[in-house]
Amino acid sequence: MRQAVLVEPKHIEFREVEAPKASDLKEHQVLLNIKRIGICGSEIHSYHGCHPATFYPVVQGHEYSAVVVATGMAVTICKAGDVVTARPQLACGKCKPCQRGEYNICEELRVQAFQANGAAQDFFVVDDDRIAVLPEGMSLDYGAMIEPVAVAAHATMRGGDLKGKNVVVSGAGTIGNLVAQFAKARGAKRVLITDVSDFRLEIARKCGIVDTLNVAKTPLKEGAKRLFGDEDFQAAFEVAGVESSIRSLMECIGKGSTIVVVAVFGKDPSLNMFYLGEHELKVNGTMMSVSYTHLRAHETVLDL
């Protein structure tokens, strides 16, 4: 079978390797025929050598849809012929976060495409506890969007109650676009999405995000003032992964507000911690998704 291996930064090899066999499956394993793969922004970071937690060589691909080829004897969640996706986290199931259901921050977490091989190959074996059967009628293309949608759903939950709040999303790539849509769906009063790319901002507008701002042309402070007036904004999502982005969010957001860091930063930003403390800003991290947000993603994509 074909397999794409990121051997080192900027070096992908396409190899012919032996395909896994149904006869070799363990009782809780599922053999998949990969049909669609999304290219995540984090994987682009890995390709360029600026992702802080990529172990080379590695097979990329963690946003995907597939058809079940065969299952182990104890598998009940799916059967041959089912169209599925799967969560990419490999968790221990034993540590304190896992026991709380927060396997996304497992003490021994490995993520396929970064610390373990992913789905950029014709056939792939996964454990059944990570399988999710796609709803009837959902296309393979949409199925590959489940994982990034789940990431966005989880990120907005990390921002707390957004109902009635003004929200800024910095970064209008795929995840930023989805975060903005979820913020809107969760009752935000107004959602402003920013980027330096007019192309990305146009896509956001086509997806229903009315208020956009190119911060390469108009500073965030000016654009936010124009949109929100004296109300300021009370929640922000950093999805660009650059120092200037999070610094401007900190400097412009209302006192006592929340900033959620969604992006993977290639370099640690230099931040004014005195300013952060003086303004009682809350900075929350977010890591992929959990079962609830993965389920929410299925419902959201099906609504599309």
Predicted feature residues:
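Mid-domain Rossmann-like dinucleotide-binding core that forms the NAD(H)/NADP(H) cofactor-binding site
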Residues: M138-K217
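Conserved small/polar residues in nucleotide/adenosyl-binding loops
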Residues: T293-T300
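Glycine-rich beta-strand-centered segment in the early N-terminal region that forms part
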Residues: A22-I37, C50-K96, R130, P135-G137
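Glycine- and other small-residue-rich loops at beta-strand/loop junctions that grip anionic moieties
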Residues: R87, F123, A144, A172, ...
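Residues in the short beta-alpha loop(s) of Rossmann-like NAD(P)-binding domains
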Residues: S197, F265, S289
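Glycine-rich cofactor phosphate-binding loops and adjacent beta1-alpha1 units
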Residues: G159-K163, E202-K282
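NAD(P)H dinucleotide-binding glycine-rich loop of Rossmann-like/cofactor-binding domains
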Residues: C92-S170
